[in-house]
Amino acid sequence: MPTPKAFALLGPTAGGKTALALKIAETLPVEIISLDSALVYRDMDIGTAKPSASERAFVPHHLIDIIPPTESYSAARFVEDCTRLVGEISSRGRFALIVGGTMMYFRALTQGLNDLPEADACLRADLDEQKQMYGLDFLYRTLQKVDPETACRLKPNDSQRIGRALEVYYLTGKPMSTHLGSLTSHTLPFDLHTAALIPENRARLHENIALRFHLMLEQGFIGEVENLRRRYPGLTAYSPAIRCVGYRQAWKYLDGKTDFPAFVEKGIAATRQLAKRQLTWLRKTPLDCVADPFSDCTSCTRLIEAAKRFFGA
């Protein structure tokens, strides 16, 4: 039996990945595997720019709407799910197209997993309580004592990563820096071709980000977050789902901690920071082919042709 194949299409948020993936689907019998840590959550459609019903009807999508926002998803689970799906899609005589920008998941898929523990809800709740009582600076100073290497690498206001680093230390008794130094050996059971959309014109990308954020507001993003608060009373500002870009800022706005103009400004700024981090990851990622989504149609056509050649179609 031939080795399964998968074509990965990576890129920053608002960088044209979905549009190009749909163009590939017009020419090849593909099924899309989402590489997006936000799309796994149900009832979070607008703020995640989830593919529309018509787009999902046109081409099968996987790893979308698979868990409620009260649960968490991990890189380890993604590797397991993605590997299984590539095999299943190949067995149907179709091609797997991995699309997204959650680079931590992609690194786990291609380079292996760190021996890190799964998230612990009780411990995370305790850390959140400490943060509320004593402030984020208290948690950061604690991290400096138990894992100075990781603390030096993180910004003092990086609440999510500071909490995760402390969680790893308390669960294992070892600093995260020790775990990150040892990757679990990993060999992909399928052939992978990696392509990326990397815009040279950052101003154009920033413009797209702002336009998309305003479009989300017009589509009812605030109402979507209000619905989440009603439907899932267990959600807090510290829940993994609400840490998604845009949702965290909307949550603070609905809590009365910021006004509407500041919410919009911070939401756009956070999305730009996400894109910057994604591009930083991409610069460190081995790529088989690259295109600029804002240059001309010829650039993206090269990626479509690369997919055809890779799949032998």
Swiss-Prot record:
It comes from Neisseria meningitidis serogroup B (strain ATCC BAA-335 / MC58). Residues 36-39, 160-164, 243-248 are annotated as: Interaction with substrate tRNA. The lineage of its organism: Bacteria, Pseudomonadati, Pseudomonadota, Betaproteobacteria, Neisseriales. Substrate binds at T13, A14, G15, G16, K17, T18. Transmembrane segments: none annotated. Belongs to the IPP transferase family. Monomer. PANTHER family: TRNA DIMETHYLALLYLTRANSFERASE (PTHR11088:SF60). Its EC number is 2.5.1.75. InterPro entries: Dimethylallyltransferase (IPR039657), IPT (IPR018022), P-loop_NTPase (IPR027417). It catalyses: adenosine(37) in tRNA + dimethylallyl diphosphate = N(6)-dimethylallyladenosine(37) in tRNA + diphosphate. One of its GO terms (biological process) is tRNA modification. It comes from the Bacteria. Catalyzes the transfer of a dimethylallyl group onto the adenine at position 37 in tRNAs that read codons beginning with uridine, leading to the formation of N6-(dimethylallyl)adenosine (i(6)A). The record marks T102, R124 as: Interaction with substrate tRNA. ATP binds at G11, P12, T13, A14, G15, G16, K17, T18. This is tRNA dimethylallyltransferase. SUPFAM superfamilies: P-loop containing nucleoside triphosphate hydrolases. It holds the Pfam family IPPT. Its cofactor is Mg(2+).
